[in-house]
Design a protein with these regions (language model features):
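A short, Lys/Arg-rich alpha-helix, primarily the initiator
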Residues: 1-17
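Residues that mark the N-terminal boundary/hinge immediately upstream of a DNA-recognition element
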Residues: 9, 20, 45-48
Length: 71
């Protein structure tokens, strides 16, 4: 099942800080395809979420903006 809120949240947050999919993928050590799938609402592993959180340098209170009670 596609989680539309997650799809919109990661993409919106990424765009709000003016970072491309390619740049986020590079910083997180992931492929652009992985970022694209997550932005489209596909589930991802906890390790992948951790990489994105670290790459975006999120504070603990900001994590819910992207992964909503999922981490």
């Amino acid at each position: 099942m596609v989680q539309k809120s997650q799809m919109n949240s990661l993409k919106s947050y990424r765009e709000s800080i003016f970072i491309s999919k390619a740049e986020l993928a590079r910083k997180a050590g992931l492929s652009v395809g992985t970022i694209d799938r997550i932005e489209k609402g596909k589930r991802c592993r906890l390790e992948t979420k951790k990489k994105i959180i670290l790459a975006l340098d999120l504070e603990p209170y900001e994590i819910g903006k992207i992964f909503e009670n999922d981490v």
